[in-house]
Amino acid sequence: MSSVTQPLAVPRPGVASLLRDYSELTKARVTTLIVMTAWTGAFFGAAKSGLPLVSWTLFHALLGIGLVSGGTAAMNEVIERESDARMRRTAIRPLVTGSMSLGHGMVVSLVMMIGGAGYLGLMTNWLTAALALMTSVVYLMAYTPLKKIHPICTTIGAFPGAMPPVLGWTAIRGHLGWEAVALFAILFFWQFPHFHSIAWLYRDDYANAGIRMLPVVERDGRSTAREIVIYAAFLLPITLTPFLLRFAGRIYFLAALVLGSMLFWVSLRMFTMNLAPSSPHSKKYARQLLLASVTYLPLLFAVMMLDRTI
């Protein structure tokens, strides 16, 4: 009696690499963070309306926002593919390596952006869809080209960067509110310590690509450090507005004071230390600030949401 051994099913070659390419194209990690901050806005929108904190509307909102965000990131990589090829940290992107064609990237981008906006309009409301598209337009048509022209690009980019919680809020509420403005302001001011620390760490890469971030234009580091301290100082009182608007309580108030003071202290250290490019401390303090900023924001929002539920 003979038996035939059936071959094991194996994944189709190229599927895993294609998924990795899509992840790189849509900046999956950044898109995930955007969805999480949008969730914060949706959370407080639901709490304000007396709606369930978990609902199908929330699902539709986060999915639509994620699609628009991922599509915008993909179009950014389409536009900046030549600059990306000149930077070590972005040279692995699929449009640079050739593992994905330019046409493929453009189609994915447009389908996600337009489809995501349409999905938001149909499943939540058209205000959110319009704001999402406006955010994409400002990011792609103002921030992206300005990166090659003037350091003000960081300020312009902070506007679309602060929109996710506003989108989450309007998706649930259907209109704007002071709570959404407060969340927008927190995210707006937080971006300066965060992105200036990144720009300082990768200033040589940016210089090679012709991207005129502040650390590239002002090589001594004083202007960068000064701007970091100023925005960190403004951020501290701004984070207290949720308490003043009474959508967060005393636990949040104390946490905002502690977290804000710690971020300001790290920012101040970067200002007081020697940040000359040749200094051995140059990247050390920028890296510490980057770590502090990426720890600060999720902790702040988590405490804000937790305080609302207890």
Curated annotation (Swiss-Prot):
The chain crosses the membrane at residues 30-47, 50-70, 102-122, 126-146, 152-172, 181-201, 228-248, 251-271, 286-306. Pfam families: UbiA. It is found in: Cell inner membrane. One of its GO terms (biological process) is heme O biosynthetic process. Its EC number is 2.5.1.141. Converts heme B (protoheme IX) to heme O by substitution of the vinyl group on carbon 2 of heme B porphyrin ring with a hydroxyethyl farnesyl side group. Belongs to the UbiA prenyltransferase family. Protoheme IX farnesyltransferase subfamily. This is Protoheme IX farnesyltransferase. It comes from Koribacter versatilis (strain Ellin345). The lineage of its organism: Bacteria, Pseudomonadati, Acidobacteriota, Terriglobia, Terriglobales. The gene is ctaB.
